[in-house]
Amino acid sequence: MSMTRADVTGITEHESEQVERANESGRTPVVFIHGLWLLPTSWDRWATLFEDAGYTAVKPGWPDDPETVADAKAHPEVFAGKTVGQVADHIDRVVGGLNKKPAVIGHSFGGLLAQIIAGRGLASVTVAIDPAPFRGVLPLPISALKAASPVLTNPANRSKAIPLTYAQFRFAFANAVSEQEAKELYDTYAVPAPGAPLFQAATANLNPWTEVKVDTTNPARGPLLILDGEKDNTVPWAIANASYKRQKRNPGVTEIMKITGRGHALTIDSGWKEVAETALAFVRRFA
């Protein structure tokens, strides 16, 4: 199994190398945070685009992330039990090693994590794409429940790593692309994911001590753009817009944009570049 060894802080050798490279470059870092059922490699094309634009990319994993999709499928147990708080603190430690305050971009639960990091005052500018909801975000559309049902229908899944079947991936991620592209995306990117974050998000509004909370009022949060795919089943517009309404109370620039005709796979499908360039344009305004 190809996994990088972590030091006592939990930061892997590969992550340390990325941080060191970013610091040596003198460029503004852009930290890319993936969500459930994906790996850091899902950001590879984004990283190239941003580096070509003059930034330096850092793609931290969640704790114990395998390096490849093949490894992830062979050893799904490594994902089990990871919580939002554990992942947020891991990203925090990676960001803490950077000499410059980074731009932070996240997708799905990565979009939630990006907002958590921004709420801690650690981001110069943030783009949250199809972000998972946090405490205080109330809408719960039927499609979002269906997308989460492979995990939430069994309480025992909280401590397990859960893969998506192709049909489940097609609904939750790839509903806005062709059948052929959906199958290619599934084979190329989909990996098992921890069940815990979905249970945490589902109960966040009932739990005052939840890890799924964002400091939306911190004036050090910085500028924030929320992007949401028009056809997203997993994070429909109602959820993204409710997140925006909570965030716009912040004194920092807060914007939201709907990406026409796109589903939850908008960061990895054939139209990824449109989304990446939209994010890049926002980052360029502030970093």
Question: What kind of feature is each model-predicted range?
Answer:
Residues G85-P102:
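Conserved acidic catalytic loop of the alpha/beta-hydrolase fold
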Residues N233-A242:
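Conserved alpha/beta-hydrolase "acid-adjacent" motif
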Residues V31-W37, G61, H107-S108, D228-G229, ...:
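The conserved beta1-alpha1 loop
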Residues A123-S159, F199-L206:
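Flexible "cap/lid" loop of the alpha/beta hydrolase fold
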Residues A220, I226-D228, D232:
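Short beta-strand/loop motif that positions the catalytic acidic residue
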Residues I105-G110, A114:
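Gly/Ala-rich beta-loop-alpha elbow adjacent to hydrolase catalytic centers
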Residues N23-V69:
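Short, surface-exposed "cap/lid" segments of acyl-processing enzymes
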Residues V253-A287:
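Catalytic active-site module of serine/aspartate enzymes centered on a nucleophile-bearing elbow/loop
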